[in-house]
Amino acid sequence: MKVNLKLIIGSILISQAQAIWPFDSSGSSSSSDSSPSETGSSGGTFPFDLFGSGSSLTQSSSAQASSTKSTSDSASSTDSSLFSSSNSGSSWYQTFLDGDSGDQKTDYAPFNLTCPSKKTFIRTASELSQQEKDYIHKRQETTNKNLIDFLSKRANLSDFDAKSFINDNAPNHNITIGLSFSGGGYRAMLAGAGQILGLDGRYEDANKHGLGGLLDSSTYVVGLSGGNWLVGSLALNDWLSVGDIVNGKSTIWQLQDSILNPSGMRIDKTIAYYYGLAQAVQAKEDAGFQTSVTDTWGRALSYQFFEEDDSGTGGANITWSSIRNLSSFQDHSMPYPIVVANGRTPGTYIINENSTIFEISPYELGSWDPSLKSFSNIQYLGSSVNNGNPNNTDICVNNFDNAGFIMGTSSSLFNQILLQLDNYSINSIIKMILEKVLTDVSDEEYDIAVYEPNPFFGADSAGIKSITTNDTLYLCDGGEDLQNVPFYPLIQNKRGVDVIFAFDNSADTNSSWPNGTSIQETYKRQFSKQGKGTPFPFAPDYKTFLDKNMGDKPVFFGCNSSDLEDLVAWHENDKINVTDVPLVVYTSNTRMSYNSNFSTFKLSYSDQEKFGAIRNGFETVTRNNLTDDENWSTCVGCAIIRRQQERLGEEQSDECKKCFQEYCWTGGFKDAASVSSVSGISGLAAKTHTSGGTSSTTQQTSTTTGSSANGGSSSTGSSSSSKKKNGGDLVNGGVPSSIFLVFNSLLGLIIAYL
């Protein structure tokens, strides 16, 4: 904790420098701004005054923003010397240095209790856990009813009896829908917020002009990194609707000030904030547990993701497993939430397709991959075990699975900065310093989350013993293997997912738009030892993705299961049928009414930016409020029922065939991302369709240009030309924010050597 505390002290010092930093520390030169009240092609302002909803995003947020801003302004303008007059002459700084905790809480620390009578905490990953089975069984009683309603009213399929189709076939198979939200920092959280809002039947405008009811019909929801900030913060706030955030009923996601400097110029409040973080993490260390920067990062995130209570501890005592106790979970009104993270071996920087992918649910942490093939009870993380059996039945641990820590685990940023440093336009001398600092930080493993004791120590089902012989389990950002859209939990055959709605808000190009890398990498992974047994539809490489403008509108992958016969056969698992491979409905972040291509490392957002990104996300998933395609909801209905129709041998309707002609990518092995090095796969080239056709090629590209609100350089919102030019380059924005993160570490390291 000594170095960790010094890093925090460094953060305090450097956070104050933001006031005089010569660049925009909250913005990205790769993102263009436009007002959220700006009229898009749909006309009207979000949320849809045009349609008579009687509410305006600008209006609904203005009171809240004004209240927040007045507090912030008064805090920053009352005393130009950075100190509140109430603290004048006081020894707040001495209190900090002396370590007087005042009334700060330490609920973050895990604590001991007697072990439960069940003596083993791990199981082999051969089936779903009984708890998940029970939840899904009850959840699908609800989703079936909601899906009947969605297909009948929203999709309005012709000559289709939704009630009999769903109910008559339920004894054999319930249609299972999974939602997958990509990583990408606050950009992904906010764009994803608009996308999930467009599916939410609790939000009236989604029912009138979107896909309202689809969220209510979904069985699973998965998030990674920034996408998990979305999923986690909604789930842990008792399945909060984004509509309540938009309308000011909830005060979470206050992003006006950077997470590094949430109190603006009030250095006394900043000191108290960082001291609270330090004290919480120190309490965990004092309890005998190793900590890392992820602990501090997770605690900081919690202040933004949870409503403040009287204790003022910012969710310090909220655990991931406590989702089980929420009313929306107990009545099965929320989809089953899952987080994705990666295993990261200490000393490594690059995580390839053979990495171990972990998933975290309200009940378990573990991996289906053959390298581990085990799951552990998340409630007892931190307990010392051997093959899941407590080493001391009198002492088990609770509270290790802090919600902020779990969300921080899935979004560690430091290794990402190191991996992408060459893509930043930084002065060579500064770059040399940063490389040295980042190497030192990475060498000390500050960029990962530390799970010690290792919950899988001695696990006998693991294929790679190095995971189970180490006292510590190391996890990191779920997108570091380039699978930034978390498909992994949803392609496990045991879950029986029919269709995945994937929302890609990645920053693959220099302009911070997606280029299909995520879906390409998941497709390729199935041909590795780790991925064998998880068939995934053919997917194009990023060049094809850009050439065909596939980011401009949704694309369906794996439309016809008959095209996947040889692909499934390659997996050599007779328990997997072609209809078990989910159809993927892929939606990319693209400009509709707002340039939401912010840097991943942008750490503060004005209300204009926040609500502009949410609005734009809503429009991407609803095809611009159904104005770009009035039949979009019908086509979504066709995608949902496709696999069940194929199981039953039912012919697709003419209207669904028309939808598939419009949205399906029909490329086969020859058109897909290259996997030429994979043994035994070459025969597929001659056996699959090679048209690669999709009418996405005819979609006009958006080339609206917006200017940055802060007077910085502007960039085009094009989803085609700019992406083609940039190809597969990594994000090149947000340098100031990244530098602040790096300088936090730099100052901490300097202090460490004093």
From Swiss-Prot:
Please name the Pfam families in this protein's record. Answer: PLA2_B
Compositional bias (Low complexity) spans?
25-40, 50-88, 687-721
Which processes are annotated in GO (biological process)? glycerophospholipid catabolic process
Disulphide bonds annotated for this chain are none
Residues covered by the PLA2c domain: 114-670
Query: Looking at the UniProt record for this protein, which Gene Ontology cellular component terms does it annotate, in alphabetical order?
Result: cytosol; endoplasmic reticulum; extracellular region; plasma membrane
- A GO molecular function for this record? lysophospholipase activity
What's the catalysed reaction?
a 1-acyl-sn-glycero-3-phosphocholine + H2O = sn-glycerol 3-phosphocholine + a fatty acid + H(+)
> What is the residue range of the signal peptide feature?
1-19
- Name residues in a coiled coil: none
Task: Write out the ranges of the annotated region (Disordered).
Answer: 25-88, 687-727
* E.C. no: 3.1.1.5
Carbohydrate attachment sites? 112, 156, 174, 317, 325, 354, 391, 423, 470, 510, 515, 560, 577, 597, 625, 631
Q: Which InterPro entries match?
A: Acyl_Trfase/lysoPLipase, LysoPLipase_cat_dom
Q: Which SMART domains match?
A: PLAc (SM00022)
Keyword list, A-Z: Glycoprotein, Hydrolase, Lipid degradation, Lipid metabolism, Secreted, Signal
Superkingdom, according to UniProt?
A: Eukaryota
Q: Where in the cell is it found?
A: Secreted
Outline what the protein does: Catalyzes the release of fatty acids from lysophospholipids. Phospholipase B may well contribute to pathogenicity by abetting the fungus in damaging and traversing host cell membranes, processes which likely increase the rapidity of disseminated infection.
Task: Give the family per the record.
Answer: Belongs to the lysophospholipase family.
- PANTHER family in UniProt: CYTOSOLIC PHOSPHOLIPASE A2, LYSOPHOSPHOLIPASE 1-RELATED
Put simply, this protein is called Lysophospholipase 3
Which organism is this entry from? Answer: Candida albicans (Yeast)
